[in-house]
Amino acid sequence: MLKLVIGLMLVAGQVSGPGGALPQVLHPDFKSASPVKAGKRAEVIISFTAIKGYVVDRELPFTLKLTEVPGVTLEKTEIAASGKDPKAKDNYYVDLPTLKVGITAAKAGKYEVPGKLKYFFCNKADGFCSTQTLDVKIPVQAE
């Protein structure tokens, strides 16, 4: 029984990596294509940067699931990135995708649209790969 417990602890330690948690591999950046005007459709563009030494798989799902908030209407609540990357020679992005979110704010004000970003990444140094889900909040400033 003791050997089983020790074995499980070793496996759990290897899966979680040093420090016990995976690093946040992608960092989103949110920009609106134009000023967000109340009552008018606008587009928020989400671009990403990856931390050095990690790559993101372009053949596995890269999705953003959003939750509507009062005062903001979303064109879509689920957005998937295209796996196309002309520079890629394998199944990893060279140029990370951008996601476009169509929104309409009912009235002027500040809003935050929550969502979950899900993607698959690999560490180039040791070959460790995993799915990661991030909580994101899209800031919206409507005039």
State the predicted function of each range.
Residues V15-E143:
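Extracellular/lumen-exposed scaffold segments
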